[in-house]
């Protein structure tokens, strides 16, 4: 047979074999087109699992009359135009083949109107000859796509479709993933005329909580740990379930790269390694994570359905994700603080900060615990202590796994504690009210609300008070950075930072090297340049390129310096992690302060706490 060019319809049907796997694939492609068009509301109507009808209606920018027919043509798109665009893709779609492929195996109708047009236009195409008919129509600004009789002209493909319930289940999962990617978009999903899912657009944290809970369930919210990390052009945020929650939730894994839903093996491997042996081989972590990468550093044009990407610096991305998840898991314990006298038995001359909430020992100022004695101590106080382990095998460090197994079996009473309140992420109202009282017999009170931008209104008995959150945060950091005799534990940086110093700063770095080591800073001076390799955990999220030169400049002015004075300097020069505070963050901060700094509760310093005078308001009301 001689070589010949395939007819357009046959070529599109071949492409449809990759793009249109099942009705859920059609929904994914069309909804992503709506998101690229700037839609804030998307209505999805399904009949008979998508075999009879798939209708997607949005309020996006729409398609002009002159572009309607071209929109159904193969390799026609408005999203890229040059090779440079292809190498830095920011849209969800870019190949220009989805509509052509779908129309080749269905009867497709596209109705659209732009803001500049006075009337809408409708384009119709079906698989036989790919002819497109355009005619006037009535439609608001936006687009509606109707896909009728999917695979009507490819009986073999239609025969492989599953039951109506199964196909709709796949559609439901696709919509769930898209709803998690775009909290700002309202999405409604109907099946056979019945509204099945309604995801309202989220504008504040309480609405984010409701939407996340409606998709992932309340159990995920209860065990979710907030994660937010940034390094250079890499940013990761979202939620990971603690190991106890991951064991209960089963496989719930949602990952997004630049807002594109993804099933990437590199990302999954990094997260699985972060959990080490805290999960069995047949258990999987649960997470909802959003990774932001420079578009030039990631190639999304490597998979037909765009489910996988290729990172230009894969090892860097892997280590970044691994370190971020590991740090969050180390910061949070498996159980709340015991309501016993254990806290009173701890030494008090130096505030002993901890790098996790409501559990156990001081991981900022204590050295790494000895593995040999771990089994004789409470399991919940040492479960997160081991250093991160790198291993690509299926066992994830077998020796560590044996130790974890012993720890988990050592103290049976730890099991009921897992049901108690943990680090507040999106806690229920009752938990928010009781959390500040759980850590210590001394409490500021109950957080009622946040008075923007940074004040917490607190109820303590019959009195109301305003608490200055940045001041409380500063005192907490001073406690966290005040080392014990062993010094603060250094946390290695993913990428060492190199800084240029003047002579005075370089001399100060050498002169104060013992002090810097005590503070958990690994600084190496070489010919007027310093390489920063490790910092204590409270400094990981800071702008180190700015902070370290300021620190060395300060040390250059002093021949002698104590760790306590330097901890105070750090506390006053560190940037806040919160531009706008919310109730959960305030409760978290107060829990830490009450736990680590009970002196502040007994004798609040100036500028921290201010009683609210209700007498004047009551007097005014009585006079009225």
Swiss-Prot record:
Pfam assignment, any one: HATPase_c_3
Family: Belongs to the DNA mismatch repair MutL/HexB family.
Keyword DNA repair (UniProt): yes
PANTHER family tied to this protein: DNA MISMATCH REPAIR PROTEIN MLH, PMS, MUTL, DNA MISMATCH REPAIR PROTEIN MLH1
A single Gene Ontology CC term: mismatch repair complex
Record field: compositional bias (Basic and acidic residues): 369-385
Gene Ontology molecular-function annotations: ATP binding; ATP hydrolysis activity; ATP-dependent DNA damage sensor activity; mismatched DNA binding
Keywords: DNA damage, DNA repair
Species this chain originates from: Serratia proteamaculans (strain 568)
Protein name, entry field: DNA mismatch repair protein MutL
InterPro entries (UniProt xref): DNA_mismatch_repair_CS (IPR014762), DNA_mismatch_repair_MutL (IPR020667), DNA_mismatch_S5_2-like (IPR013507), HATPase_C_sf (IPR036890), MutL/Mlh/PMS (IPR002099), MutL/Mlh/Pms-like (IPR038973), MutL_C (IPR014790), MutL_C_dimsub (IPR042120)
Location of region: Disordered: 360-396
């Amino acid at each position: 047979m001689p070589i010949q060019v395939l007819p357009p319809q046959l070529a599109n049907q071949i492409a449809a074999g990759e793009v249109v796997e099942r009705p859920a694939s059609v929904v994914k492609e069309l909804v992503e087109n709506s998101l690229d068009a700037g839609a804030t509301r998307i209505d999805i109507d399904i009949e008979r699992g998508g075999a009879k009808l798939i209708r997607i209606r949005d309020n996006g920018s729409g398609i002009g009359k002159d572009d309607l027919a071209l929109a159904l043509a193969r390799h026609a798109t408005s999203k890229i135009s040059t090779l440079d665009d292809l190498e830095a893709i920011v849209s969800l779609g870019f190949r220009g083949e989805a509509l052509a492929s779908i129309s080749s195996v269905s009867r497709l109708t596209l109705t659209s109107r732009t803001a500049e047009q006075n009337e809408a236009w409708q384009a119709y195409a079906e698989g036989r000859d790919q002819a497109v008919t355009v005619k006037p129509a009535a439609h608001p600004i936006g687009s509606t796509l109707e896909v009728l009789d999917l695979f009507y002209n490819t009986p073999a493909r239609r025969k492989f479709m599953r039951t109506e319930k199964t196909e709709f289940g796949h559609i439901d999962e696709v919509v769930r993933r898209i709803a998690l990617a775009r909290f700002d978009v309202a999405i409604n999903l109907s099946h056979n005329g019945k509204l099945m899912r309604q995801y309202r657009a989220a504008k504040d944290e309480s609405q984010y909580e409701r939407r996340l809970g409606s998709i992932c369930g309340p159990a995920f919210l209860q065990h979710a740990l907030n994660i937010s990390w940034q390094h250079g052009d890499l940013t990761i945020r979202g939620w990971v379930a603690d190991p106890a929650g991951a064991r209960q939730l089963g496989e719930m894994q949602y990952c997004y790269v630049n807002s594109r839903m993804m099933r990437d093996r590199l990302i999954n491997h990094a997260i699985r390694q972060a959990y080490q042996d805290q999960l069995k081989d047949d258990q999987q972590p649960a997470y909802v994570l959003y990774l932001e990468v420079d578009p030039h550093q990631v190639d999304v044009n490597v998979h037909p359905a765009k489910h996988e990407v290729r990172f230009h610096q894969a090892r860097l991305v892997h280590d970044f994700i691994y370190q971020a998840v590991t740090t969050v898991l180390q910061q949070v314990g498996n159980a709340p603080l015991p309501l016993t006298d254990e806290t009173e038995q701890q030494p008090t001359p130096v505030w002993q900060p901890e790098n996790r909430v409501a559990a156990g020992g001081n991981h900022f100022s204590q050295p790494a615990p000895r593995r040999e004695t771990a089994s004789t101590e409470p399991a919940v106080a040492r479960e997160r202590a081991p250093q991160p382990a790198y291993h690509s095998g299926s066992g994830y460090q077998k020796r560590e796994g044996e130790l974890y197994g012993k720890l988990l079996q050592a103290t049976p009473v730890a099991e009921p504690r897992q049901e108690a309140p943990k680090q507040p992420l999106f806690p229920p109202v009752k938990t928010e009210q009781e959390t500040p009282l759980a850590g210590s017999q001394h409490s500021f009170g109950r957080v009622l609300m946040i008075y923007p931008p940074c004040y917490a209104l607190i109820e303590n008995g019959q009195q109301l008070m305003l608490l200055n959150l940045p001041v409380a945060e500063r005192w907490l950091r001073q406690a966290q950075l005040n080392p014990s005799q062993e010094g603060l534990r250094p946390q290695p940086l993913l990428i060492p930072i190199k800084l240029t110093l003047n002579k005075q700063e370089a001399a100060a770095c050498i002169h104060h090297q013992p002090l810097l080591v005590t503070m958990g800073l690994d600084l190496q001076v070489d010919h007027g340049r310093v390489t920063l390799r490790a910092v204590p955990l409270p400094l990981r999220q800071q702008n180190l390129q700015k902070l370290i030169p300021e620190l060395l400049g300060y040390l250059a002015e002093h021949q002698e310096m104590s760790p306590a004075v330097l901890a105070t300097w750090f506390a006053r020069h560190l940037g806040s992690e919160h531009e706008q505070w919310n109730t959960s963050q305030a409760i978290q901060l107060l829990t830490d302060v009450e736990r680590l700094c009970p002196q502040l509760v007994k004798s609040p310093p100036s500028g921290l706490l201010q009683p609210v005078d209700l007498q004047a308001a009551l007097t005014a009301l009585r006079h009225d």
